UniProtKB/Swiss-Prot annotation:
Domain of life: Bacteria
Gene3D superfamilies the UniProt entry points to: 2.40.50.110
Transmembrane regions: none
UniProt cross-references to InterPro entries, sorted A to Z: Enterotoxin (IPR008992), Pertussis_toxin_subS5 (IPR015356)
Disulfide bond positions: C61-C75, C126-C132
Pfam family, one: Pertus-S5-tox
Stretch forming the signal peptide: 1-34
Summary of subunit composition and partner proteins: Pertussis toxin contains five different chains, S1-S5. They are organized into 2 functional subunits: A, composed of S1 (which is toxic) and B, containing S2, S3, S5, and two copies of S4 (B binds to the membrane receptors). Dimers of S2-S4 and S3-S4 are held together by S5.
Protein name: Pertussis toxin subunit 5
Species for this entry: Bordetella pertussis (strain Tohama I / ATCC BAA-589 / NCTC 13251)
Entry GO CC: extracellular region; host cell plasma membrane; membrane
Function of the protein: PTX oligomer B binds to receptors on the eukaryotic cell surface and facilitates the translocation of the toxic subunit across the cell membrane.
GO molecular function, one term: toxin activity
Length: 133
């Protein structure tokens, strides 16, 4: 599927149905089905956290680490989320995980540009007793 500049991505009806079903089941977000590849990283810790101002918008980026694995870099912008609490909630989770050195699970969509952070789709703090299942 190709996106023309300024136009929304035209979704295949089967992808739309599949993405809604998988999203309702809590397996994948709609971006997983129609967009770039996504990856779930479990039991990582937040090593770095940065908040950036970009014009009228905010963006936070984090670097997550797990011993024996490569670093994961992901960012989330509040662009498009000005009227809801999604960005604030995810930022709160990231700050808490960083401050408490908690393990996290994060879902990241690959960046189309090599060497740049992926898009953070979801962030969860693992239970205090240890590991994400």
């Amino acid at each position: 599927m190709q996106r023309q500049a300024g136009l929304p991505l035209k979704a295949n009806p089967m992808h739309t149905i599949a993405s809604i079903l998988l999203s309702v089941l809590g397996i994948y977000s709609p971006a997983d089905v129609a967009g770039l590849p996504t990856h779930l990283y479990k039991n990582f810790t937040v090593q770095e956290l940065a908040l950036k101002l970009k014009g009228k918008n905010q963006e936070f980026c984090l670097t997550a680490f797990m011993s024996g694995r490569s670093l994961v870099r992901a960012c989330l912008s509040d662009a498009g989320h000005e009227h809801d609490t999604w960005f604030d909630t995810m930022l709160g989770f990231a700050i808490s995980a960083y401050a408490l050195k908690s393990r996290i699970a994060l879902t990241v969509e690959d960046s189309p540009y090599p060497g740049t952070p992926g898009d953070l789709l979801e962030l969860q703090i693992c239970p205090l007793n240890g590991y994400c299942e």
